[in-house]
Amino acid sequence: MKYDNLLDRFIKYVKVNTRSDPDSETTPSTESQEAFALTILKPEMEAIGLQDVHYNPVNGYLIGTLPANNPTLTRKIGFIAHMDTADFNAENVNPQIIDNYQGEDITLGSSNYKLDPKAFPNLNNYIGQTLITTDGTTLLGADDKSGIAEIMTAIEFLTSQPQIEHCDIKVAFGPDEEIGVGADKFEVADFEVDFAYTMDGGPLGELQYETFSAAALEVTFLGRNVHPGTAKDQMINALQLAIDFHEKLPAKERPEYTDGYQGFYHLTGLTGTVEEARASYIIRDFEEASFEARKVKVENIAQSMNAQLGTKRVLVELNDQYYNMKKVIEKDMTAIELAKEVMEELTIKPVIEPIRGGTDGSKISFMGIPTPNIFAGGENMHGRFEFVSLQTMERAVDVIIGLVCKA
């Protein structure tokens, strides 16, 4: 094993339930994230040689510093990963380790689930490697505990090899990325770097500086309930209004029909009765004009329906969540060019594609710190079929070390 503690560190992290809670109003959204930061990560950061390790209870970030040991390396580089996991069972994570994978089906514990290369052809990219999977009852949490483990392992390597020269390094582990609010309270003044990287990507080589622009849409439908036996010309069914609204959106502009640079409308929740219904959507696009046009479209649909109904029964609430960080990063591509150069020197082919999602870097970039995203290794994230390759994680550690030594 290239880095002795990487696997054990990762296994230790994923066994801690740090699932975030979208309905919480606290920061972090769950107590387990703060406990993870204070009882596991903070002591370990101090033990491996990070300095000024401190936890900010206001924003939930745990930050540490490794000062440069060569004054000619003047850049300051940050590395960021998130502590929370996605909206899937994270209690009693029991990882499986598959050594020397040879393309077979992988039975997930004693569950009835398996990782089948026919269903998941990405498995064929990992022949001969060590895979870490779930037992079929939980997610794994490689998103983003692989990133945390990689950053920690890189720091440990550097402090154990003081002859290796590196620049100033800042490390930040934050909360609630999966529910879209993790970076809302991020303190730039507490993270003085020239640029940073989130270690939150997927397969080997991913290097990303384009994200969706994102908005949350809540639509409330106000009906009028009367006895169905005498409902003619009187009843207004709020659930039917919700159906009508949804059908006015472009049918092919949904996640299941889009890829690449295509945006979408995604219905994530629908609840209600005849009297009142509520639909929750997320809106995503890459280009600013297209993003704004999508928001205008839903407003226009609501206005048209209200005009037809003769009163305001379709109420729209739109909230922007984050924006495409390309707008910031393309002004100075130093972080991207450096990462490309380091990867190529390590014989890793950079895979530069848009993220069909967002990272904490989306918001942090607009706060003044360009923060692209680098691969951390996770595959099939956010569910029971999640897995990660140990060899990909090792290569991510290589990249982190390469970046700070080349700065």
UniProtKB/Swiss-Prot annotation:
| Reactions accelerated catalytically | Release of the N-terminal residue from a tripeptide
Q: How is the cofactor bound?
A: Binds 2 Zn(2+) ions per subunit.
Output one GO MF annotation.
metallopeptidase activity
What are the positions of the active site? Answer: 84, 177
**One Pfam family this chain carries?**
Peptidase_M20
Main EC class of this protein?
hydrolase
* Keyword match Hydrolase: yes
* Known EC number: 3.4.11.4
Where, by residue number, does Zn(2+) 1 bind?
A: 82, 143, 200
InterPro entries, per the entry? ArgE/DapE_CS, Bact_exopeptidase_dim_dom, Peptidase_M20, Peptidase_M20_dimer, Peptidase_M20B
UniProt keywords (A-Z) are: Aminopeptidase, Cytoplasm, Hydrolase, Metal-binding, Metalloprotease, Protease, Zinc
Tagged with keyword Protease: yes
Cofactor(s) listed: Zn(2+)
Q: Which domain of life is it from?
A: Bacteria
Q: What PROSITE patterns does its record include?
A: ARGE_DAPE_CPG2_1, ARGE_DAPE_CPG2_2
Where can this protein be found? Cytoplasm
Q: Which residues bind Zn(2+) 2?
A: 143, 178, 382
Provide the Gene Ontology terms for cellular component.
cytosol
Q: Which GO terms describe its biological process?
A: peptide catabolic process; proteolysis
Q: What does the record give as the function of this protein?
A: Cleaves the N-terminal amino acid of tripeptides.
Q: What family is this protein classified in?
A: Belongs to the peptidase M20B family.
Annotated HAMAP family: Aminopeptidase_M20 (MF_00550)
This chain's protein is named Peptidase T
